[in-house]
């Protein structure tokens, strides 16, 4: 009696051998590094939150104070992203198309939120926008309180997310051919028509990408917001600060669940950003 053994073609064996032969030390180091720095912390958070069960997770994630912090965090971050979508586009346009004294200094200042420690940024913003600060004193007579309110949270999120839209747009603006604009003008188009029909369409993907990047950065902001906000529940308390407060109270399950919610939102945003970038590349190729 004969037994037919499974046959593996030489080409498949060669492909497997070639794969293992192609693995190099940099590849191994990269995988280990990413596992330790990115994958394991995320996996630990997800496993910890999953251990509570669906019902326990839902009860903690939907408490009134948690829902209030989601509202403050996500809506304020979205508002900051939309404002920077407009003003960041204007800043990028000026830096690319206009020549003026001190342009390099202004361009370098755009990256200040990247370099400045967030706690220092929060301290500076709270000092400027308090009712006795250089800026806040002009709004105080009208009953407008910026620092230690939700408006202060908005200002901090605008500050830390501005570079994302500017730096995303600048390369696209630099690659736009001015000949297309000149052709539109020669055909009788106004400046507004030229901008709306020739310049603006290629800018839509990077603008949306910049807004998404700024939004995701603002959602996770802690250092600058905690100093300019009053951090009062149901007023201007944001989700990252609530996570820290729960850790201070040794309420690790609540901190884990709220952190998992923020992580889920961040992963969804990363997916959206990747889709927007692919759309932008296809649009540029077309």
Swiss-Prot record:
GO cellular component terms listed in the entry, alphabetical order: plasma membrane
Location(s) in or outside the cell: Cell inner membrane
InterPro entries listed in its UniProt record: CysT_permease, MetI-like, MetI-like_sf, Sulph_transpt2
Occurrences of domain ABC transmembrane type-1 (ranges): 70-273
Membrane topology: Multi-pass membrane protein
Keywords, sorted A to Z: Cell inner membrane, Cell membrane, Membrane, Stress response, Sulfate transport, Transmembrane, Transmembrane helix, Transport
Recorded GO MF terms: ABC-type sulfate transporter activity
UniProt xrefs under PANTHER family: SULFATE TRANSPORT SYSTEM PERMEASE PROTEIN, SULFATE TRANSPORT SYSTEM PERMEASE PROTEIN CYST
Subunit annotation: The complex is composed of two ATP-binding proteins (CysA), two transmembrane proteins (CysT and CysW) and a solute-binding protein (CysP).
Function comment: Part of the ABC transporter complex CysAWTP (TC 3.A.1.6.1) involved in sulfate/thiosulfate import. Probably responsible for the translocation of the substrate across the membrane.
Family: Belongs to the binding-protein-dependent transport system permease family. CysTW subfamily.
Protein name: Sulfate transport system permease protein CysT
Lineage of producing organism: Bacteria, Bacillati, Cyanobacteriota, Cyanophyceae, Synechococcales
